[in-house]
Regions:
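Short, compositionally biased P/S/T/A/G/V-rich stretches that sit at domain boundaries
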Residues: 1-35, 154, 158-183
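Short glycine/proline/serine/threonine-rich loop/turn segments at secondary-structure transition edges
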Residues: 103-116
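Contiguous beta-strand segments within globular domains
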Residues: 29-46, 51-57, 96-103
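Short beta-strand elements
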Residues: 77-90, 118-183
Length: 183
């Protein structure tokens, strides 16, 4: 068996909660900006069993809901999704790993509050772990991110490019050694 190929080798421990924990201000380095903008930061803490895994992919899905769209014609729910590839996952000193994504400040302001955050971990194209947190109308709807009745609903807009790898955000230097390295 290839190290990392079994779902038994992975366990998702914790996802960012959907209360105010996800809102973070980016540090301002040499900027004259009067006020740092808030980003939406969504992290996953997970365990791996093999000492070294060459590469994994994590798909992050976040659903937001707003009662009053800021732009006329906007839908009340917005789905953000991205996949990030991570390399050289080493579990020699610690089996716990941390990875994450950030939602751009403009998207955070425009689309309301998160009602669902889901993570899927893939090894060699096969899903080996998944988990989610949900509130509001998604509460109790496990695997909502794969349910076409939800994600393809006429009330849901899908937005590309707004959810970015943490290592490609202003948070890349915050607690750098705690996060896995993306490709």
């Amino acid at each position: 068996m290839i190290p990392g190929s079994s779902p038994k080798h992975y366990k998702i421990q914790k996802l960012t909660s959907l209360d105010k924990d996800y809102r973070q201000r980016a540090r301002s380095l040499g900027s004259s900006s009067a006020k740092a903008k808030e980003w939406g930061c969504f992290d996953v803490s997970f365990l791996t069993l093999p000492p070294v895994i060459g590469e994994i992919s994590i798909t992050y899905t976040v659903m937001f809901q707003t009662d009053k769209p800021l732009v006329p014609g906007d839908k009340t729910m917005t789905l953000f999704k991205t996949t990030v590839d991570y390399v050289d996952i080493v579990s020699i000193k610690s089996k716990e790993h941390l990875a994450g994504v950030c939602l751009l400040p403009g998207a955070l302001q425009r689309h309301g509050k998160p009602i669902g955050f889901a993570v899927q971990i893939f090894f060699d194209g096969q899903e080996v772990a998944s988990d989610s947190v949900e509130v509001g109308i998604l509460a109790g709807r496990k695997s909502w991110w794969t349910d076409s009745k939800i994600i393809d609903s006429p009330n849901v807009a899908t937005r590309e490019g707004c959810l970015v790898d943490r290592m490609k955000s202003p948070f890349q230097l915050n607690d750098l050694d705690s996060y896995e390295v993306s490709r």
